[in-house]
Swiss-Prot record:
Residues 2-224 are annotated as: DCB. The modification N-acetylmethionine is found at residue 1. Homodimer. Interacts with ARFGEF1/BIG1; both proteins are probably part of the same or very similar macromolecular complexes. Interacts with PRKAR1A, PRKAR2A, PRKAR1B, PRKAR2B, PPP1CC, PDE3A, TNFRSF1A, MYCBP and EXOC7. Interacts with GABRB1, GABRB2 and GABRB3. Residues 508-528 are annotated as: HUS. Residues 1514-1532 have a biased composition (Polar residues). One of its GO terms (biological process) is regulation of ARF protein signal transduction. Residues 654-785 form the SEC7 domain. Residues 232-285, 1514-1535 are annotated as: Disordered. This is Brefeldin A-inhibited guanine nucleotide-exchange protein 2. GO terms for molecular function: GABA receptor binding; guanyl-nucleotide exchange factor activity; myosin binding; protein kinase A regulatory subunit binding. Residues 244-260 have a biased composition (Basic and acidic residues). It is linked to Periventricular nodular heterotopia 2: A developmental disorder characterized by the presence of periventricular nodules of cerebral gray matter, resulting from a failure of neurons to migrate normally from the lateral ventricular proliferative zone, where they are formed, to the cerebral cortex. PVNH2 is an autosomal recessive form characterized by microcephaly (small brain), severe developmental delay and recurrent infections. No anomalies extrinsic to the central nervous system, such as dysmorphic features or grossly abnormal endocrine or other conditions, are associated with PVNH2. Changing residue 209 to K: In PVNH2; uncertain significance.
Length: 1785
């Protein structure tokens, strides 16, 4: 009831107000009066009925609505502004409060609803510019209410009409308030239209969700839930939630919906199904609509009033729509306009045409009429924005320009507020492609700044929200507009500025930047947008060709800054994109004990914060169901990029030389080899130069013809007009200039055309088509070439083609139509190609600003044509768009553009002093370094770091006095990079640390601390400038060269100090220090690089001969302290570098430097040793190695002394913690042991003595690994001949070490180390005894006699004392060491030294060896007897009589001492040994040697045979070296000139003779025991003298020698030796001639040589053995052989004796005859018979010689025995028989 009364009140008052108007009373308004009166009467009647309660509240019906609306319609049609205003106001309120819904059918127009008629009536109230301003405002209010009201629905044409009317009011109204209100209303309407469309989909999604949530899911519902439509709707809902507005937009991230728009969206979001109406209304709906209207109108009026008189008031709306392009305000729009009727009519007609023509088609594609509404409005706005501007300079107040601007602004608003449906629905995407993008291609090159600016803003929005669907359109916009404007030299500053402002936003979005690279640069068919963009920005940032652009220097600088800002943003995006790969060293630690402080964390976040604040990554836009997406595979894209580069290079080659390009592409596998493949390539690849394509196809070569045929055959001319076919044929290339080439092409074209159109009847043959095609080409040239003045007429053309159709004419109408078509449009290449070529060809230098503008306008026009053609070409195309997600894209991106980026930053830093430019360049370099670091791109990283270092001026050759603020900032940046990217810097640390080093020097010089660096050495006299040259050369690298070399005055110094003053600030000093303190947080590889380059810089600092600096050396010490707590693996790698550096520094020729190094080493070592060391680790060994190196290489006594003292201090204070370090300690002392400085030797020996005697007592297990080094060290002390007392004491300590090994074998056995291949049982030997004994042998071999004798004694004492603990195989090793003593004899040395060695050491050693062997025979005989025999043989064979005698003596002693333990095998070996010695020492040369050239003297045949009674052993023997074993040929001519050779030979022969004699004696002593034979001979003599043999009886039965232990075979071997020796000596003694020759040659001396002693002793020994065996019952089995041997030997001996002429010779044989006869007499009768019968004749002969009485007595006994045995004589009385004749058995 209340509602009805309210409505009645509105209507009544309005009608009464209309009737009351005096205008209504005029006659022409009679119908209006009647309608008003009728309506009032009905209202009164209705109210009366309601008051009386006679009827229920009436429901709205169609007839009633008609009655109510008719007076208002008539009122609106009246010409009275007041009446119209009143009517409109009432309608607006009725609609706003829901009193009119308009759902009733329109009685006057079937198929329409009343609301459509109402809206049409409201719109008709606007009659153009002359419409009353109040009426205009009421129209705007009414229409906004109609669109926004929740009570009514208007769609399609009606809603389009409301928008059009407001649009026209904005254009036509002269009132600023109305204009602003109309514009705001338009924005609000669009907001409502598109919001309702989005909310409708949300509503559907909610309705789909309700049954799913409330009921158990059936299979059908489940299928629906996962259907694409449902998923899309649900996704759309999620995307449009107001709770997630954080998404960053390319349009500066603001949300363009106005507050009023939000209100209307929230309160008007109850969409209904098609055609439905609301059954009820919200209580507050009317108030809400009222508020909206009041807000819109009030705010519009207020803003217009505030800005009255200012330019472009609609920019307020622009601000609401988030446009932020910093271009100065544009033009005034307050002027009056004309021609609105035309404009409105064109709008209406266009839109009506669209609505009528496409109504059903469009509606069929939309799921709701709201979507169609939005589509129609959007399309209309696009078409409005495409309307061309008038000719000439654009008028800011013209309808065309204002229409274009507002349409673009509204489009921008729509796009910025686009919801999920608009962003994903295929119809809207297609609308954007077909209408908006084409519109942008025209407006995007507009010369009007506002239009251009809006176009850019729209493009930004498209790029932000729609790039998934607009891949190819975005490419066109970039390639043909953005980049062309940047590249064109004639572009205006305003256009460049706006483009680069837009690029600033694009480049600040990481997702967008990476997407551009992935989708264009990595697409085979797309342009390299990213690469080209960066290159263009780089050129702008470098400020090239600035003066040619018509810009002021300030404008150029602004542009440079923006270019740099874009480049920096791109790198920031890359950093942001790859941030997950970055490890900040300041947020971790490599030391377990350390943690970051809050201050350090804060300090380290600089770059991170800057990076994070740059821009957040864009979210991926939602793709529609029809959009193709590609999987993001970085490796695949990289492969594509490589292929693309190959193709581009091939195209580049083709455009120079086609065949070469084709060949290259085929070689790379990018192009097939068949002609069809090549033809297809020519068709598809638009980047090919069209002229080159034409020339290639027209060439006469066979291959070219085949390609051309394939090219034409791939064209389809079916059912095409001839001219159209020809156009298609010629659009892909430019016709070549040669007529023959054209002829070939036309011939093939004609053939192909006829082939495709075989059913045609126009052409008689292909010849006709060929001639006609040729004539068309000629016609095109004639009509369209500016060179042709007189153009061909149609008649002339027809005449020219007479008779070409098989001698007949083609129809004139046909030829005429061809002429007209060609006249209207020439035949040319494809428009995109033609325009692109035209654009590129117009680039030229301009002479004036006017010329530049004209040329630029021409270029912009061509650009627009190209862009429009390309946009239209791709409007229906679909291209897959990849939304990049992988981090790995950044690496190839950066690799592609790092060089132009570096060029831009370098030139910016070098040429521009602007602080903002420098700041941008430095920030860019920082980001570039970060990227290069993260992806391990060493070349790129090093290049950027070197650039920073270069611009710091710290390493440049220019004077450091030129340092400016940018250079200071560069230094700070370099320090920051070191701090934040240290983990990745690698070799780049070199540049950074070099700069830090030079920075420290600059600080010192700048603060006056070290001005001596500028004036040479401080030792020079004052005022001298001689040092300048040196200092200048020294610090050229610092940039001090120019400052120094020219001398230093006060002004220069002041300037210098001022320039480097800031580098000495606390912040810089702290930052530098933080690099070193922060080294603990570098990872394991980075710290090694850091240390390596710090050491390299330190070496450079120390390289100065005059002023070495120790800054870096000090830092090395510091970081060693800081990093000492790292894990051992890392620390060992660090110390490997630092230790090597200390090696070099410790040997620095400058003593101060070396002292500092050694002292630093000491401090570090003490700290390191405090940590201790676990078993089997070797870190101490590595750490202390520099001391060892310094001792080895540095000969400075000061440094060596200091090193020894440092080690001594460590030993005294840290002995308990030292493990593997003992090796280095002993190595250092080993070096000191050989020093000539007594103090060094004494100090080292004292510490060594302390270690061995004291520390080993307590820490022996820890030092086992170095025990060998300790012994070696002592050995070195012992070998220092300059300090004999130390030598003896050292040997004593070695003996002392043996005590440790003996007492602690278990410790040695249990010790495990690197030599794990040593068996536990052998460790005592390998680590204990062997080193001791080996070093003693070294002492023996190296030292002088007293020391080596002591060493020899100690060595054998140790053997004898501890040998019982040795294993058998240890003895083998030991004797190899012992035998090394004799190895010294094998070296060529001085004769005197060798002789001394043989007679002392070797002699001593031989006897000692035999003693040890005897002592430990059981252990040694199996393993070492052969070696000992071999060694004895070697000694015997030496040319040293003493050694030879000692060898035989030792052999004798060895056998006598141990023979009773010998096995038969050992006796075999022993006998073989003696046999070998015998054979090798027989001096056969004595019998054969002859002096060369000496003739035999016959007088010498009868020589005096008197011999001296002295034995051969008394012959004068000269000391000799080991001589030759063989004599040279007697015929050698060199004998006369080489007497020394003879002496050497004779000495050797003498020694052999001595050895033979010694060996005979040795055999005798071994078999019968020493002195037994002599005693026996003496007894025989006595017996002979006494004429009795009784004394011999007891000797026969006592065998003290080895006889009883030797087998007969062993004895036979010895007998062979003896017999051979006897035979040789007998032969020599009998050869008087040879003896004379030798005597004359100097052999023997004064008397003739003889071997009488050898002759007799060998035979005597032989006889004794044989006779002993002959009577030995145990050898009965060998008696026969013995007897045979005995008979032979004795017979030969007696026979020889008879032949001897010399009395002295016979005298020497006396004892032999006594022995022979005496022994024979002692055998039994049976055996005696055999002997007597053999000897008898010889004995009879002997009787004739003058014999001594003893021999005659024995002969007498022998003959008496013969008589008895042979019974010649029988004694009468036994008592009378001589004792000799009594039987012995």
């Amino acid at each position: 009831m209340q509602e009805s009364q309210t409505k009645s009140m509105f209507v009544s008052r309005a009608l009464e107000k209309i009737l009351a108007d005096k205008e209504v009373k005029r006659p022409q308004h009679s119908q209006l009066r009647r309608a008003c009166q009728v309506a009032l009467d009905e209202i009164k009647a209705e109210i009366e009925k309601q008051r009386l309660g006679t009827a229920a509240p009436p429901k709205a019906n169609f007839i009633e609505a008609d009655k109510y609306f008719l007076p208002f319609e008539l009122a609106c049609q009246s010409k009275s502004p007041r009446v119209v205003s009143t009517s409109l106001d009432c309608l607006q309120k009725l609609i706003a409060y829901g009193h009119i819904t308009g759902n009733a059918p329109d009685s006057g127009a079937p198929g329409k609803r009343l609301i459509d008629r109402i809206v049409e009536t409201i719109c008709s109230c606007f009659q153009g510019p002359q419409t009353d301003e109040g009426v205009q405002l009421q129209i705007i209010k009414a229409l906004l209410t109609a669109v926004t009201s929740p009570h009514i629905e208007i769609h399609e044409g009606t809603i389009l009409q409301t928008v059009r009317t407001c649009y026209n009011i904005y254009l036509a109204s002269k009132n600023l308030i109305n204009q602003t209100t109309a514009k705001a209303t338009l924005t609000q309407m669009l907001n409502v239209i598109f919001t309702r469309m989005e909310n409708q989909v949300l509503q559907e999604a909610r309705e789909l969700e309700k049954p799913i949530q409330s009921k158990p899911q059936s299979p059908v519902i489940q299928a629906a839930a996962v259907s694409p439509k449902f998923v899309r709707l649900k996704h759309s809902q999620a995307q449009s939630k107001p709770t997630t507005p954080e998404k960053t937009d390319l349009t500066n991230g603001e949300h363009a919906r106005s507050d009023s728009g939000k209100v209307s969206t929230e309160n008007g979001d109850a969409p209904r199904e098609r055609g439905s109406s609301l059954s009820g209304t919200d209580d507050g709906a009317q108030e809400v609509v009222k508020d909206i209207l009041e807000d819109v109108v009030t705010s519009a009026i207020k803003e217009a009033a505030e800005k009255h008189g200012l330019t472009e008031p609609e920019r307020v709306l622009g601000e609401l729509e988030c446009q932020e392009c910093a271009i100065p305000p544009g033009v005034d729009e307050n002027s009056q306009t004309n021609g609105i009727a035309d404009d409105r009519q064109s709008l209406s007609s266009a839109d009506n045409l669209e609505s009528d023509a496409q109504g059903h088609q469009v509606a069929a594609r939309f799921s709701h009429v709201l979507q169609k509404d939005a589509f129609l409005v959007f399309r209309s706005l696009c078409k409005l924005s495409m309307k061309p501007l008038g000719e000439g300079p654009p008028d800011p107040k013209s309808h065309e320009l204002r229409s274009k601007v507002v349409s673009l602004q509204l489009l921008l608003s729509v796009l910025q507020n686009a919801g999920p449906v608009f962003r994903t629905h295929e119809m809207f995407i297609n609308a954007i492609k077909q209408y908006l993008c084409v519109a942008l291609s025209k407006n995007g090159v507009s010369s009007v700044p506002d239009v251009f600016e809006l176009s850019l803003a729209i493009f930004l929005t498209l790029l932000s929200n729609f790039k998934m669907h607009l891949k190819m359109q975005i490419e066109v916009f970039f390639k043909e507009i953005f980049l062309n404007i940047l590249e064109t030299s004639t572009s205006s500053f305003e256009h460049r500025w706006m483009v680069i402002q837009t690029l600033t936003r694009i480049c600040a979005d990481a997702q967008c930047v990476v997407d551009i690279y992935v989708n264009y640069d990595c697409d085979l068919n797309a342009a390299n947008i990213f690469e080209r963009l960066v290159n263009d920005l780089s050129k702008i940032a470098q400020g090239r060709s600035g003066h040619e652009l018509g810009m002021t220097p300030l404008q150029e600088l602004s542009l440079r800054k923006k270019g740099l800002e874009c480049l920096v943003s791109i790198l920031k995006c890359m950093v942001e994109w790859s941030k997950d790969l970055y490890v900040n060293p300041n947020h971790q630690t490599s030391l377990g004990q350390e943690r970051l402080t809050d201050q350090e964390i804060g300090d380290g976040k600089g770059l991170d914060m800057a990076r994070r604040c740059s821009v957040t990554s864009m979210e991926s836009t939602v793709s529609s169901g029809t959009q193709t997406t590609v999987q993001d595979d970085p490796e695949q894209f990289e492969v594509i990029k490589q292929q693309k580069e190959i193709i581009e290079h091939g195209i580049e080659l083709f455009n120079k030389k086609p065949k070469r390009g084709i060949q290259f592409l085929q070689e790379q596998g990018m192009l097939g080899t068949s002609v069809e493949d090549i033809a297809q390539f020519l068709h598809q690849e638009e980047r090919l130069d069209s002229t080159q394509v034409g020339d290639f196809l027209g060439d006469s070569a066979r291959f070219n013809k085949e390609v051309m045929y394939a090219y034409v055959d791939q064209l389809d001319f079916c059912e095409k007009e001839f001219v159209s076919a020809l156009r298609t044929f010629l659009e892909g290339f430019r016709l070549p200039g040669e007529a023959q080439k054209i002829d070939r092409l036309m011939e093939k074209f004609a053939a192909r055309y006829i082939e495709c159109n075989q059913g045609q009847t126009l052409f008689a043959s292909a010849d006709t088509a060929y001639v006609l095609a040729y004539s068309i080409i000629m016609l095109t040239t004639d009509l369209h070439s500016p060179q042709v003045k007189n153009k061909m007429t149609k008649e002339q053309y027809i005449k020219m083609n007479r008779g070409i159709n098989d001698s007949k004419d083609l129809p004139e109408e046909y030829l005429s139509s061809i002429y007209e078509e060609i006249e209207g449009k020439k035949i040319a290449m494809k428009e995109t190609k033609e325009l692109t070529i035209a654009t590129k060809s117009t680039k030229q230098n301009v002479a004036s600003e006017k010329q530049r503008r004209l040329l630029y306008n021409l270029e912009m026009e061509q650009m627009a044509k190209t862009a429009k053609a390309l946009m239209e070409a791709v409007s229906h195309a679909k291209a897959p768009f990849t939304s990049a997600t992988h981090l790995d894209h950044v690496r190839p991106m950066f690799k592609l553009v790092w060089t132009p980026l570096l060029a831009a930053y370098s030139i910016g830093l070098q040429n521009c002093d602007d602080t903002e430019v420098a700041s941008l360049c430095l920030e860019g370099i920082r980001c570039a370094i970060r990227i290069a670091c993260i992806f391990g791109m060493q070349l790129e990283r090093d290049a950027y770091v070197q650039a920073l270092a270069r611009f710091s001026l710290l390493t440049a050759s220019s004077s450091i006095t030129e340092m400016k603020q940018k250079n200071i900032d560069t230094i700070k940046t370099l320090i920051t990079v070191a701090h934040t990217d240290g983990n990745y810097l690698g070799n780049s640390w070199h540049e950074i640390l070099k700069c830090i080093s030079q920075l420290e020097l600059a600080q010192l010089i700048g603060t006056g601390v070290k001005t001596r660096y500028l004036s040479g050495s401080g030792r020079e006299r004052e005022g001298s400038l001689k040092g300048h040259t040196l200092a200048g050369e020294e610090f050229m690298g610092l940039g001090l060269g120019n400052l120094v070399s020219g001398g230093v005055d006060k002004r220069q110094m002041a300037s210098f100090q001022e320039s480097v003053g800031e580098t000495s600030s606390q912040s810089v000093v702290v930052a530098v220090d933080r690099i070193f303190t922060g080294s603990t947080r570098l990872d394991g590889n980075a710290i090694v690089d850091f240390v390596r380059w710090l050491c390299a810089v330190s070496m450079d600092e120390l390289a100065s001969p005059h002023h070495p600096r120790m800054f870096s050396l000090q830092k090395i010490v510091e970081i060693s302290y800081y990093n000492m707590n790292r894990i051992r693996l890392q620390w060992s790698r660090i110390w490997h570098v630092i230790g090597d550096h200390f090696n070099k520094v410790g040997c620095n020729p400058n003593e101060d430097v070396a002292i500092f190094a050694v002292d630093s080493l000491r401090q570090l070592s003490m700290k390191f040793l405090e940590k201790g060391e676990l078993a089997n680790f070797r870190f101490q060994k590595d750490f202390l190695r520099p001391f060892e190196h310094i001792m080895k290489k540095n000969r400075s006594p000061t440094i060596r002394d200091m090193a020894i003292r440092c080690i001594a201090q460590m030993v005294n204070s840290q002995a308990a913690n030292i493990r593997s370090g003992w090796k280095n300690i002993f190595a250092v002392f080993h070096q000191a042991a050989s020093d000539h400085d007594g103090n060094i030797v004494e100090l080292a020996f004292q510490t060594t003595c302390h270690i061995v005697t004291t520390i080993f007592q307590h820490h022996f297990p820890a030092a086992i690994d170095s025990f060998q080094d300790a012994v070696k060290c002592l050995s070195e002390f012992a070998c220092n001949a300059a300090f004999p007392d130390t030598s003896m004491e050292a040997i004593r300590l070695i003996r002392f070490c043996g005590k440790y090994v003996s007492e602690r074998p278990r410790v040695l056995q249990e010790y495990t180390s690197d030599d794990m291949n040593v068996a536990p049982g052998d460790r005592v030997w390998v680590r204990g005894w062997f080193p001791i004994l080996f070093e003693l042998s070294c002492i023996i071999n190296r030292c002088k006699l007293d020391v080596r004798t002591r060493g020899l004694t100690v060595m054998f004492e140790i053997m004898k004392s501890y040998g019982h603990t040795f294993e058998k195989h240890w003895w083998q090793d030991l004797f190899r060491i012992v035998f090394r003593i004799f190895d010294n004899m094998k070296l060529p040395e001085q004769l005197s030294e060798k002789s001394e060695w043989m007679t002392t050491t070797c002699n001593h050693a031989l006897y000692a060896i035999c003693d040890v062997f005897t002592q430990f025979y059981e252990a040694l005989n199996e393993v070492l007897l052969s070696d000992v025999f071999a060694q004895l043989q070697w000694c015997v064979k030496q040319d040293n009589e003493q050694l030879a005698r000692s060898g035989t003596n030792c052999l004798e002693n060895l056998v006598i001492s141990n023979g009773e333990k010998f096995s038969p095998e050992v006796w075999d070996e022993t006998c073989n040994c003696m046999l070998d010695i015998f054979k090798t020492t027989i001096p056969h040369v004595l019998l054969t040697w002859r002096p060369v050239g000496m003739e035999e003297d016959s007088s010498e045949k009868h020589l005096d045979v008197d011999l001296d009674r002295q034995s051969l052993s008394s012959i004068d023997k000269n000391p000799s070296e080991r001589g030759q074993s063989q004599l040279s040929n007697p015929t050698d001519d060199s004998w006369k000139g080489r007497p020394y050779a003879n002496q050497k030979l004779f000495a050797s022969l003498l020694i052999k003779c001595v050895v033979q004699l010694e060996l005979i004696q040795t055999i005798d002593n071994i078999v019968f025991y020493p002195a037994t034979s002599k005693k026996e001979d003496a007894e025989h003599m006595v017996a002979a003298q006494q004429d009795t043999l009784d004394a011999d009886i007891h000797i026969e039965t006592e065998d003290q020698g080895m006889y009883k232990y030797m087998s007969s075979q062993h004895l036979f071997k010895l007998l062979d030796c003896l017999q051979e020796s006897h035979s040789f000596s007998k032969a020599f003694n009998s050869n008087y001639e040879q003896r004379t020759v030798l005597w004359r040659a100097g052999f023997k001396g004064k008397s003739k040589p003889n071997l009488l002693k050898q002759e007799t002793s060998s035979l005597a020994c032989c006889l004794r053995i044989l006779f002993r065996m002959y009577v030995d019952e145990n050898r009965r089995d060998s008696w026969e052989e013995i007897q045979q041997r005995l008979l032979t030997v004795c017979s030969e001996a007696l026979a020889y004796f008879i032949t001897v002429n010399s009395e002295s010779h016979r005298e020497a044989w006396t004892s032999l005859l006594l022995l022979l006869l005496t022994k024979t007499l002692k055998i039994n009768d049976e055996k005696f018979k055999a002997h007597a019968s053999m000897y008898y004749p010889y004995l009879c002969e002997i009787m004739q010689f003058d014999l001594i009485p003893e021999l005659r007595a024995v002969l007498r006994k022998f003959f008496l025995r013969i008589g008895v045995v042979y019974k010649i004589w029988i004694p009468e009385e036994p008592s009378q028989v001589p004792a000799a004749l009594s039987p012995v058995w």
